[in-house]
Amino acid sequence: MKMIKLILLLAVLGVGTTAAVMYSGVVNVAADEPHSDFVYWILEETRKNSIKKAAANIKVPDLTDPELLLSGGVDYEFMCASCHLKPGQRESDMSLGLYPAPPNLTVPDNNDDIQVERNNFWVIKHGIKASGMPAWGKTHDDQRIWAMVAFIKRLPTLTPDQYQVLTAVE
């Protein structure tokens, strides 16, 4: 009986504390103020593990087709570059204004395994809540999303001139 009372007391305290935090306004949700290291760690680990689990069984097609690179480049230019940058670009108004900051996809990550491609596909298709990353799967089919994944895979190796050629609209 004492154990049940203790569990009930802890549950009431947990709900009460949660409600107090939610309704007091003490948590700063401003995008220009970073989370504490602890909160950031919790959110980042949750994000990484959620994507990894959701993307684990995605079958990756051949991403070496030049047509994929070209069509993915055009979409990247119009849909991604303002946040994830272009070769030679260090920051943009969008990359500076978003929190958490979007990853700079022009920088090599030295991680060329198939899980990265699966993760990129899943993130592009489904987006990430409360991050500014849209779910492009609502408006783009899988082939178009794979084209963006193929382009992103090559992006860190591109010069600004190569980028211009691959992202030019005909």
Q: Which functions belong to the PLM regions below?
A:
Residues 2-70, 114-115, 137-151, 169-170:
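Periplasmic c-type cytochrome electron-transfer domains
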Residues 66-89, 120:
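Sequence/structural segment immediately N-terminal to covalent heme-attachment motifs in c-type
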Residues 88-91, 101:
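Charged heptad-repeat coiled-coil "stalk" segments of single-pass membrane proteins
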Residues 92-97, 163:
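Short cysteine/histidine-rich zinc-coordinating motifs and their immediately flanking basic loops
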Residues 97-153:
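Extracytoplasmic electron-transfer domains, predominantly the class I c-type cytochrome c fold
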Residues 156:
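Low-complexity, rRNA-contacting terminal tracts
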Residues 159-170:
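Extracytoplasmic/periplasmic copper-protein system
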